[in-house]
Amino acid sequence: MIEKEEGTGTTSELFPPLLLRSGQVLKNRIVKAAMEENMAGTGQLPDERILTLYRRWAAGGVVLDEHSPLKPFAEWAKAGKSGGGAIWMQINQPGRQIPSGTPGVVWGPSGIGVSMGRHSSRFGRPTAMTPRQIDDTVTRFAVTAHRAEKAGFDGVEVHAAHGYLPSQFLSPPVNKRTDQWGGSLENRARMLLDIVRAVRAAVSPSFAVAVKLNSADFQRGGFDADDARQVIAMLEPLGVDLVELSGGSYESPAMTGRPADDSTQARGAYFLDLAKDLVRTSPVPLMLTGGVTRRVTAERVLYNEVARPTLSERRPHSGSVVRATHCAATEHQ
């Protein structure tokens, strides 16, 4: 939650509207980042508890959201937009980062499980996906985006960060494939790019499409800032409205507030230094997520650090929300 306080200037950079490539206009530059509320009702559907929560968030500004019958989701979208902002659905496939005992097959780019020492057994051992399974997953993202638009959401965000499935394909230590989805960065990014193409084709031109991407995996030999720069450039021709920058995975949870650089932590924005570097060459607006909890920090990011930022914040229970637009900063999911 971004605390209310006096800003750093008479005209705050947090509040001007942001025109996206799709033509959608966001009211300001603060976003509630997508998260797991763990509040689903019977049948894993949104119910009155989550609608109440989103009405409260909507009173403060723009929101992003996560993942059946369409009516409960339509009610969810309506609640999220009740304050006049926009609501986007985040679409995710966890891949190997799925708890042990979950029904079904655990998928991954390769048969490499999550390595967390004595906690590794908490996650299922993945099976390397076949080309047909990869194509089916791409289709499922597109179908979900189409249904999200029908339900009244204003956009979707493809989750390709935090060690989830598209992020696993991007990561050299996890993706050991030798086919068209492995090896070079272009091959490792193929699944994500195919997902974005399919999603963009499945929705209307005015429907926003975003991607959540690691600025770095924070693992030896992993996806890094230079990789992120190249992937952002690959996404631009596909009609992406913005890219949300985060970092880490379950194995290296930088997104929880454990960044590699202590000075960045002290300044309150976990991935600010990486974002400052990436924004110089990014052809699309960037949203910065992680650790921006005070208005003065958010304004410093916008005034002095990241030229085109969007600030996202998440916490379901407390205080007022300072509204904003362009690129954002928050806590992870």
Question: Which ranges hold each PLM region?
Answer:
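Flavin-dependent oxidoreductase catalytic cores
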Residues: M1-Q333
